[in-house]
Amino acid sequence: GVLPLKNPEVSLFGATATSPVYGGTGSGAVNTADAPSYVDALTESGLTVTNTALLDWYREEEYGRDFSSSGEEINEAKWSAIQKSDAASTFGNGEVAVFVVGRVGGEANDLKSTNHVDGGYNPLGADVSANSDYLMLNKNELGILAGLKELKDAGKISGIVVLINSANPVSAAFLNDETYGIDAAVWIG
């Protein structure tokens, strides 16, 4: 298997890679002022994050979540937009791809498993939510995983790890779907 990582180089993907879920909402919220980023944590563990330019792109294009107003905001980029970004040359060089999925919920922000409005919140107006279940991956998230599988099949990345960053359960049927070629998953709560 791909874990433990033998290759010290990783690329991070997913809007949650730039805006980690550190806690819940309401009384489950935590002070994140001194909380490490994924890049900091991985670097301190002896790994090299090869695509920090993509993470900068996520921030510049306003992908990510605004946890303070609603827990149901999945604002993930489309794979086609990632490929067209200036940062596309910073990944696909034999490293392990780590796709970070995040879901937040808690007091005063209960997670609904149904009736999620297609499209969700997105300041850019893009269609970012294709299914009706916040606990499932949306079409953009699944599109990134499919794109990563294409890179893996072409020998451009050496593996795919999904990092589930949620204190709440997430529907994980996608993990065993061969469409996405996932080699390992870690739930970090």
Over which residues does each language-model region extend?
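C-terminal non-catalytic regions of proteins with extracellular/luminal or membrane-system context
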Residues: 1-189
